Amino acid sequence: VGAMAAILGLNFETVSQITNSSANDQVCQAANDNDPGQVVISGHKNAVEETIELAKDAGAKRAILLPVSAPFHCSLMQPAADTMAKALSEIILKDPIVPLVANVKANKEVNGETIKDLLVEQVTGSVRWRESIEFMSSEGVSEVYEIGAGKALSGMVRRIDREINVNQVFDTSSVRAAVLKLK
């Protein structure tokens, strides 16, 4: 039913225009603005496949389907967003000590109730990763930590802003090093 694809070599605005012209009666949305040359699309499989071809015609270097279990960050995820909203309505989320940068808004938030709304919104909304990193840089963030195996986010951060020092935390020794660095 749903699919996602990575479009390399086109910016978010261009890919958004392509998705708007290709979807016909099906959903296809720009789902992730990862870095200046990487955008992920999400929606109905046929619409995503059509958008891949249109993106290649528009000059994309590569456009490939991603092995995902669902079309995340698009309107097809509304039932999941509704379920999340119901679950979050039953809890109290305290205001954070450190501001949260919500990737759906690319801005900081300090109100727990608003953060609950943003968590729901991100299920169907575009991930504004590039803008979030740019915002954090403008706020003076000079150090980021990617926690977990892999280097995908670290690579994106480097392509967005080479001035930010990227640290990877993936095992016991790297956790210790991060803790020492943060003290």
What are the residue ranges of the model-derived segments?
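Alpha/beta catalytic cores of group-transfer enzymes, especially the acyltransferase/condensing modules
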Residues: 1-124
